[in-house]
Amino acid sequence: DLELTATPGALYVEVNGRALYVEHGVQVRDGRIALPLEVLAEAAGLQLTWDEVEGAAWLSTDQAQPASASYPAEDLYWLSRIISAESRGEPLLGQIAVGNVILNRVESSQYPDTVEGVVFDTKYGVQFQPVSNGTIYDAPASSSLVAAKLCLEGTDVVGESLYFFSPALSAGRWIVSNATYYTTIGGHQFYV
Protein backbone atom coordinates (compact mmCIF):
# COMPACT_ATOMS: atom_id res chain seq x y z
CA ASP A 1 0.00 0.00 0.00
CA LEU A 2 1.07 3.55 -0.69
CA GLU A 3 0.15 6.36 1.69
CA LEU A 4 1.37 9.73 0.41
CA THR A 5 0.74 13.11 2.04
CA ALA A 6 1.59 16.23 0.03
CA THR A 7 0.92 19.67 1.51
CA PRO A 8 0.98 22.62 -0.91
CA GLY A 9 4.10 24.72 -0.32
CA ALA A 10 5.89 22.05 1.74
CA LEU A 11 9.45 21.12 0.77
CA TYR A 12 8.73 17.42 1.26
CA VAL A 13 6.11 14.72 0.94
CA GLU A 14 5.48 11.99 3.49
CA VAL A 15 5.33 8.47 2.08
CA ASN A 16 4.74 5.43 4.30
CA GLY A 17 6.73 7.02 7.14
CA ARG A 18 9.48 8.42 4.91
CA ALA A 19 10.12 12.05 4.07
CA LEU A 20 11.09 12.80 0.46
CA TYR A 21 12.50 16.20 -0.53
CA VAL A 22 10.69 18.29 -3.17
CA GLU A 23 13.23 20.89 -4.28
CA HIS A 24 10.80 23.63 -5.34
CA GLY A 25 8.07 22.61 -2.94
CA VAL A 26 4.75 20.89 -3.46
CA GLN A 27 2.86 22.98 -6.00
CA VAL A 28 -0.75 23.35 -7.06
CA ARG A 29 -1.46 23.72 -10.77
CA ASP A 30 -4.99 24.09 -12.11
CA GLY A 31 -6.34 23.06 -8.72
CA ARG A 32 -4.30 19.84 -8.54
CA ILE A 33 -1.19 18.84 -6.60
CA ALA A 34 1.89 18.74 -8.84
CA LEU A 35 4.99 16.74 -7.90
CA PRO A 36 8.20 15.99 -9.82
CA LEU A 37 8.23 12.56 -11.47
CA GLU A 38 11.42 11.68 -9.56
CA VAL A 39 9.56 12.07 -6.27
CA LEU A 40 6.55 10.06 -7.45
CA ALA A 41 8.78 7.29 -8.77
CA GLU A 42 10.71 7.12 -5.50
CA ALA A 43 7.48 7.14 -3.49
CA ALA A 44 5.88 4.34 -5.49
CA GLY A 45 9.04 2.30 -5.96
CA LEU A 46 8.87 2.72 -9.72
CA GLN A 47 11.75 2.88 -12.17
CA LEU A 48 11.93 6.21 -13.99
CA THR A 49 13.55 6.46 -17.42
CA TRP A 50 14.12 9.76 -19.20
CA ASP A 51 14.54 10.34 -22.93
CA GLU A 52 16.24 13.73 -23.06
CA VAL A 53 16.01 13.91 -26.86
CA GLU A 54 12.27 13.27 -27.02
CA GLY A 55 11.54 15.06 -23.74
CA ALA A 56 9.64 12.00 -22.58
CA ALA A 57 9.61 9.92 -19.41
CA TRP A 58 8.56 6.35 -18.67
CA LEU A 59 7.61 4.83 -15.35
CA SER A 60 8.01 1.07 -15.08
CA THR A 61 5.82 -0.88 -12.68
CA ASP A 62 7.93 -4.06 -12.93
CA GLN A 63 8.55 -5.23 -9.37
CA ALA A 64 7.14 -1.97 -7.97
CA GLN A 65 7.39 -1.74 -4.18
CA PRO A 66 6.08 1.40 -2.46
CA ALA A 67 8.62 3.16 -0.30
CA SER A 68 8.66 2.41 3.41
CA ALA A 69 10.63 3.95 6.23
CA SER A 70 13.81 2.22 7.31
CA TYR A 71 16.02 4.74 9.05
CA PRO A 72 18.63 3.57 11.55
CA ALA A 73 16.78 4.25 14.82
CA GLU A 74 19.81 5.56 16.71
CA ASP A 75 20.80 7.91 13.87
CA LEU A 76 17.26 9.27 13.58
CA TYR A 77 17.07 9.70 17.38
CA TRP A 78 20.29 11.74 17.76
CA LEU A 79 20.11 13.57 14.42
CA SER A 80 16.58 14.83 15.09
CA ARG A 81 17.60 15.99 18.58
CA ILE A 82 20.75 17.87 17.53
CA ILE A 83 18.85 19.48 14.63
CA SER A 84 16.08 20.55 17.00
CA ALA A 85 18.42 21.83 19.71
CA GLU A 86 20.71 23.71 17.29
CA SER A 87 18.13 25.08 14.87
CA ARG A 88 14.74 25.34 16.56
CA GLY A 89 12.84 28.16 14.88
CA GLU A 90 14.93 27.98 11.70
CA PRO A 91 13.28 27.28 8.33
CA LEU A 92 13.23 23.64 7.20
CA LEU A 93 16.20 24.24 4.86
CA GLY A 94 18.20 25.56 7.82
CA GLN A 95 17.33 22.47 9.84
CA ILE A 96 18.35 20.21 6.95
CA ALA A 97 21.62 22.15 6.66
CA VAL A 98 22.46 21.50 10.33
CA GLY A 99 21.74 17.81 9.78
CA ASN A 100 23.94 17.83 6.69
CA VAL A 101 26.88 19.11 8.75
CA ILE A 102 26.42 16.27 11.24
CA LEU A 103 26.31 13.64 8.47
CA ASN A 104 29.27 15.26 6.68
CA ARG A 105 31.25 14.90 9.90
CA VAL A 106 30.23 11.23 10.15
CA GLU A 107 31.74 10.74 6.68
CA SER A 108 34.91 12.73 7.49
CA SER A 109 37.98 10.96 8.88
CA GLN A 110 38.43 13.93 11.26
CA TYR A 111 35.37 12.98 13.34
CA PRO A 112 33.70 9.92 14.88
CA ASP A 113 31.90 7.68 12.40
CA THR A 114 28.43 7.67 13.99
CA VAL A 115 25.82 10.39 14.46
CA GLU A 116 25.91 9.91 18.24
CA GLY A 117 29.72 10.00 18.19
CA VAL A 118 29.73 13.30 16.28
CA VAL A 119 27.10 14.86 18.55
CA PHE A 120 29.02 13.98 21.72
CA ASP A 121 32.54 14.45 20.28
CA THR A 122 34.90 16.20 22.73
CA LYS A 123 38.22 15.72 20.90
CA TYR A 124 38.67 19.51 20.62
CA GLY A 125 36.20 20.38 23.37
CA VAL A 126 32.43 20.06 23.30
CA GLN A 127 31.36 20.64 19.70
CA PHE A 128 27.72 21.57 20.22
CA GLN A 129 26.26 23.78 22.95
CA PRO A 130 23.13 21.60 23.39
CA VAL A 131 25.42 18.85 24.72
CA SER A 132 26.75 21.29 27.36
CA ASN A 133 23.40 22.74 28.37
CA GLY A 134 21.42 19.49 28.20
CA THR A 135 18.92 20.53 25.52
CA ILE A 136 20.18 17.63 23.39
CA TYR A 137 17.93 15.43 25.55
CA ASP A 138 14.76 17.44 24.85
CA ALA A 139 12.14 15.89 22.58
CA PRO A 140 12.72 17.15 19.03
CA ALA A 141 10.33 19.47 17.22
CA SER A 142 8.29 17.64 14.58
CA SER A 143 9.99 19.67 11.83
CA SER A 144 13.38 18.47 13.11
CA LEU A 145 12.25 14.87 12.79
CA VAL A 146 11.25 15.57 9.18
CA ALA A 147 14.60 17.32 8.55
CA ALA A 148 16.49 14.34 9.99
CA LYS A 149 14.58 11.94 7.73
CA LEU A 150 15.29 14.14 4.71
CA CYS A 151 19.01 14.19 5.59
CA LEU A 152 19.07 10.41 5.97
CA GLU A 153 17.36 10.17 2.56
CA GLY A 154 20.30 12.10 1.08
CA THR A 155 18.89 15.63 0.82
CA ASP A 156 21.88 17.98 0.77
CA VAL A 157 21.74 21.78 0.91
CA VAL A 158 25.24 22.70 2.14
CA GLY A 159 27.62 20.54 0.12
CA GLU A 160 30.60 19.32 2.15
CA SER A 161 30.22 21.85 4.98
CA LEU A 162 31.64 20.67 8.31
CA TYR A 163 30.92 23.77 10.41
CA PHE A 164 28.12 26.18 11.17
CA PHE A 165 27.44 28.93 13.66
CA SER A 166 24.93 31.66 14.33
CA PRO A 167 26.53 35.13 14.13
CA ALA A 168 23.76 36.45 16.40
CA LEU A 169 24.87 34.07 19.16
CA SER A 170 28.59 33.54 18.57
CA ALA A 171 31.53 35.32 17.02
CA GLY A 172 32.61 32.09 15.33
CA ARG A 173 36.19 33.34 15.27
CA TRP A 174 37.81 29.93 14.83
CA ILE A 175 35.47 28.93 11.99
CA VAL A 176 35.81 32.25 10.16
CA SER A 177 39.62 32.10 10.40
CA ASN A 178 40.07 28.41 9.56
CA ALA A 179 37.28 27.38 7.18
CA THR A 180 35.85 28.58 3.86
CA TYR A 181 32.43 30.25 3.85
CA TYR A 182 29.82 28.27 1.90
CA THR A 183 26.40 29.86 2.46
CA THR A 184 23.94 31.37 4.93
CA ILE A 185 20.58 29.73 5.58
CA GLY A 186 18.28 31.33 8.12
CA GLY A 187 20.34 32.45 11.11
CA HIS A 188 23.32 30.15 10.48
CA GLN A 189 26.44 30.49 8.37
CA PHE A 190 27.94 27.28 6.94
CA TYR A 191 31.60 26.62 6.24
CA VAL A 192 33.63 23.94 4.46
Q: Which residues does each predicted region cover?
A:
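Bacterial extracytoplasmic/cell-wall-associated proteins, especially those involved in peptidoglycan
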Residues: 66-192
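Primary recognition of N-terminal secretory signal peptides and signal-anchoring hydrophobic helices
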Residues: 1-80
